[in-house]
Amino acid sequence: MEREDWDRRYGGTELIWTAEPNRFVVEELGDLPAGRALDLGAGEGRNAVWLAERGWRVTAVDFSPVALDKARRLARARGVSVDWALEDLRDYQPEQAAYDLVLAAYLHLLPAGRAAVLGGAVAALARCGTLLVVGHDLANLTEGVGGPQDPAVLYTSKAIVAELDGLTVRRAGRVRRPVDTVAETGGAVDTLVLATRD
């Protein structure tokens, strides 16, 4: 989806997702010592705000000004500071070797765009830094509910790992999470890849 599509989707007064962070973000990153974090495709800011509440110095990037307005409101309501950046990630060049954590959660781009973003994410990691990539898995089309219906933008752990040259993969595979919304009830199948720069 393009910026205008996301602006329309984020246009209501309520958050599309909850204000609570993604469960895999909490499970995988909750024990990391705070440092400098980069949230790529931050949307309404739930993960960035959660990280900031835990002492991280967060830069959160998204291309939807509507989403970032909601994210700023969420951060104010929670009493935390986040550096919000309005950028199209397909063109964004993060500071290199600068972040202890880079997060890309549910950032679904066509393969060339995804490769560019993940290349930038890898370059942005400092020594001993952690990268977490989580998003809808290709298997979600047949085994799960929700998420994009275009196979070209869905993840597999193999495809994500192939973009992480120079990192040590700590975990890569499919994970399941419950989905219970007005529109859908069931489970979603996601890809989760956790990698570090040694």
Regions found by a protein language model. Name each.
Residues 78-89:
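Conserved SAM-binding strand-loop segment of SAM-dependent methyltransferases
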Residues 115-127:
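A short glycine-rich, Lys/Arg-flanked "PGG" loop and its adjoining helix->strand segment in the class I
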Residues 100-114:
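A short SAM/SAH-binding and catalytic strip from SAM-dependent methyltransferases
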Residues 64-66:
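Conserved SAM/SAH-binding beta-strand->alpha-helix loop
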Residues 128-136:
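Conserved beta-strand signature within the Rossmann-like core of class I S-adenosyl-L-methionine
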Residues 92-101:
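A short acidic, Gly/Pro-enriched loop at the edge of an enzyme's catalytic core
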Residues 1-32, 35-43, 139:
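Conserved class I S-adenosyl-L-methionine
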